[in-house]
Regions:
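Hydrophobic alpha-helical scaffolding
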Residues: 21, 47-51, 120, 149-152, ...
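Alpha/beta enzyme core
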Residues: 3-7, 14-43, 58-66, 79-203, ...
Length: 530
């Protein structure tokens, strides 16, 4: 087996074809710089000449000096009625300013005859002419054998002839593409084993995930000798996506012993994943292997007890190797080990002999039976654990009362309903009313609460707190409009983020609970810093 594999990232080209992914030119430049810092060998930047954005990207990248990565221009073989030297697409690759190009060509006779509408022999000449032309002008030319595995199944000898045509013309690497993503690993292994006997130049793998096998197929090809693996960060790609480099890289490094990236850069894998998610404006996938929030999250009490004693019992790698960390979840499935481990994470003094331990465990189980969920609301969980002790006093105890009232009205002059929230606080007989308008009752309530409280907690940063996310889930749908609901909110202050939760038959009351917890958690964090 190879001791190293070339990482070829196509996030900016194939990944950008994914539904809901839209990179600006600035985004593309930032992603390219991040991938270079991360240690990727090749960065496929797009198809120069096919659209203004990719043209502008390659223009901008002329000003960027990459440390180690090579920028790759992507394109297609020449058109059927043009010479390679006259083809606009091939000329655009040469004019892109980079020295490495990847072009795709037809491997499947069905596509040659029905899509390209030419003869099988002419397709071989198209491949040969295109590769040969680019080799005269560029240092490296990679040939993507589009639909190779489907083509091989339909007409094995012809599919191989397309590879040999590219090889004879000077292609530096023949990339076998499972373009439709339907090939099974056992079929891939059989086909790759056969074609290895016929080709002399290195080969690579480009797998799509339509059968949830892109990573498995990529690893299978590498075990059989592939020297280059194509993929995208987070598996972005058309339809069901491409092979996920965030899964391939740690599998190569930690399980197959293939040194495709440095240890230091491997520890930045989660950071890179989240960085690209942010630029793509997509949520982070909690259940993504290796780097997702749930990848090393433990919920069952027996599992937690075991993993604390020996992480190997329920963790296949050390989370920190990929920049992740273990999370202990507290729920109605929790045992004492969960509570103790979570308390240790939060620096809350708690031991097996602490009387609060049983109190906390019972409270968690009771609240979750009522519909509370603490897995996304660790701010509320920390407050719950502190309230179980005798030394914690809520900051809201200073108020003799803190009430709210909300009015929502639809007026002819307004295109949408507007809400007004009034918060009343009383301290030592002094009563203060504060009101705020908002786009909906919860937005108004949030504004009113944050408007009145800074007066009582000056210098504690409440002015910076913002509601980032708000989710409502109906827990007892059978009861219709009287159903119990759970509100989960995420708040942030520009530096940190935290989640809190509330449950009630009234969505506004559930929201109030979560908002109050959010403010109290912020005040708690600020007090600990000071």
């Amino acid at each position: 087996m190879k001791t190293t594999v070339q990482l070829y990232d196509t996030t900016l080209r194939d990944g950008a074809q994914a539904e809901d992914v839209n990179f600006s030119v600035e985004d593309m430049v930032r992603v390219a710089k991040k991938l270079d810092q991360f240690g990727v060998r090749y960065i496929e930047g797009g198809w120069p000449g096919s659209n203004p954005r990719d043209v502008e990207f390659f223009k901008e990248m002329r000003r960027v000096k990459l440390r180690k990565a090579k920028l790759v221009a992507f394109g297609a073989t020449r058109r059927t009625k043009l010479k390679a030297s006259e083809d606009p697409s091939l000329k655009a690759l040469v004019a892109s300013g980079v020295l490495t190009a990847t072009i795709y060509g037809k491997s499947w006779d069905l596509h040659v005859l029905k899509a390209l509408k030419t003869t099988l022999d002419e397709n071989l000449r198209i491949i040969s002419d295109s590769v040969a032309f680019l080799k005269k002008h560029m240092d490296e030319v990679f040939y993507d054998a589009e639909h190779f595995f489907d083509g091989y199944k339909a007409n094995a000898e012809y599919a191989i002839q397309t590879l040999l045509a590219a090889e004879a013309a000077g292609a530096d690497c023949l990339v076998l593409c499972d373009t439709n993503g339907g090939t099974l690993p056992n079929d891939l292994e059989r086909i790759v084993t056969n074609i290895k006997r016929r080709i002399k130049v290195p080969f690579g793998i480009h797998a799509h995930n339509d059968s949830e096998l892109a990573v498995a197929n990529s690893l299978a090809a590498i075990r059989l000798g592939a020297v280059q693996v194509h993929g995208t960060i987070n598996g972005y790609g058309e339809r069901c996506g491409n092979a996920n480099l965030c899964s391939i890289i740690p599998a190569l490094k930690l399980k197959l012993g293939i040194d495709c990236i440095s240890d230091a850069n491997l520890s930045k894998l989660r950071e890179v994943s989240r960085y690209v998610d942010e630029l793509a404006n997509l949520p982070h996938r909690k259940r993504q292997p290796y780097i997702g929030d749930s990848a090393f999250a433990h919920k069952a009490g027996v599992h937690v007890d075991a993993v604390v004693k020996n992480p190997l019992t329920y963790e296949h790698i050390i989370p920190e190797r990929v920049g992740n960390k273990r999370r202990i979840l507290v729920s109605d499935l929790a045992g004492k080990s969960n509570i103790l481990q979570k308390a240790a994470e939060l620096n809350i003094p708690l031991s097996t002999n602490s009387p609060e331990l049983i109190t906390i465990l019972k409270k968690v189980k009771q609240l979750e039976s009522e519909g509370y969920e603490f897995e996304g609301a660790e701010g509320s969980l920390e407050l719950l654990m502190l309230r179980a002790g005798h030394n914690y006093e809520s900051v809201f105890n200073m108020f003799d009362r803190i009430d709210y009232r909300i009015l929502t009205e639809r007026r002819k002059v307004d295109p949408h309903p507007v809400s007004e929230a009034t918060v009343t606080v009383e301290v030592g007989g002094n009563i203060e009313h504060t009101a705020a308008w908002g786009n909906g009752p919860i937005n108004a309530l949030d504004k009113a609460l944050r408007k009145v409280l800074p007066k009582y907690f000056p210098g504690r940063g409440l002015e910076n707190v913002r509601l980032i996310d708000y989710k409502v889930r109906v827990l007892t749908a059978a009861e219709g409009t009287a159903a119990r609901v759970r509100v989960l909110i995420e708040s942030g202050d520009g530096t940190n983020k935290w989640g809190t939760v509330g449950v009630s038959e009234n969505v506004i009351e559930a929201s109030w609970q979560a908002l109050v917890d959010s403010i109290e958690y912020k005040l708690l964090r600020t007090a600990k810093k000071n």
